[in-house]
Structures are given as C-alpha cells and as structure tokens.
C-alpha cells in the first residue's frame, strides 16, 4: 500500500517557518500572562466522555472525536448503545478540561487561581475553508 502524503482532511502539517512564528506568539502570550500572575498548566488531550458530553446533547456533542473502549472493556457483541462502546474522547476546547482540573486540584491551588493553558484541541465537525479539525487554543 502506498503512503498517503497529504494529511487527513481537516488537518495540516506545520512547516518550520510557521512553527517559528507560532513559538514566538506563544512565548509572548506566556510572558504577558506571567506578568499578571497566571500559572501555566497542562491537561490531558483525552477526557472522560461524560465530561465532554452535555446532558442536553446539542452542538458540542457533534464536536467530539470519540475513542472506543479497549481490550476487555470493548464488547462489540453486547453493545446496545454508544455508551457501551465509548468511554473517552479528544478535548474539543480547553474549558472543560480546565473545569475538571480545578475541581480535582482545588485544594492544592492558590486563591485566586489564574491559569494559562495552550494546547491542541480537536473538533469532529466538517472542515471548512480556513477551519481545521485540529488547532491550537489558548485558555
């Protein structure tokens, strides 16, 4: 099978010059936020599906790249609904992970807590001109 050279639809390669610009901008953001007392944090790109899904469904539900259960947890022949197959997903923004992070670590964080997070997010919606399925976000 021949190697497919182009990235998956909605994704893009970042060449060195663009990476230089991105790193410059990210460093400026870190420096500026640091001046105002913000601390850098990092959260996993994979979150529990319950945290990513809203109870009402809606638009956010359509954004989630869902990850199938693995190993013994995945029982295809017994699955009756999506919840039987999926237990996690890729974050579609940084706000949901920040909420989980704060909830989990509040006792160890200063008050007030000022957080800066920059990282990739993924959205499963159909890509359009100038919009990608994977992109960098700052929260």
Language-model segments: what does each one mean?
Residues 1-139:
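TRNA-recognition modules of translation machinery and tRNA-sensing kinases, especially anticodon-binding
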């Amino acid at each position: 099978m021949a190697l497919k050279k182009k990235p998956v639809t909605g994704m893009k390669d970042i060449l060195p010059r663009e990476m230089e610009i991105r790193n410059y901008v990210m460093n400026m953001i870190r420096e500026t936020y640091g001046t105002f007392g913000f601390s850098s944090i990092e959260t996993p790109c994979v979150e529990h599906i319950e945290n990513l899904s809203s109870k009402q469904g809606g638009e956010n539900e359509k954004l989630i790249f869902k990850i199938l259960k693995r190993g013994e947890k995945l029982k295809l022949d017994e699955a009756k609904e999506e919840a039987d197959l999926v237990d996690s997903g890729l974050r579609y923004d940084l706000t949901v992970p920040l909420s989980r992070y704060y909830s989990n670590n509040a006792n160890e964080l200063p008050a007030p807590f000022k957080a800066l997070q920059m990282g990739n997010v993924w959205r499963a919606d159909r890509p359009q001109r100038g919009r990608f399925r994977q992109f960098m976000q700052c929260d």
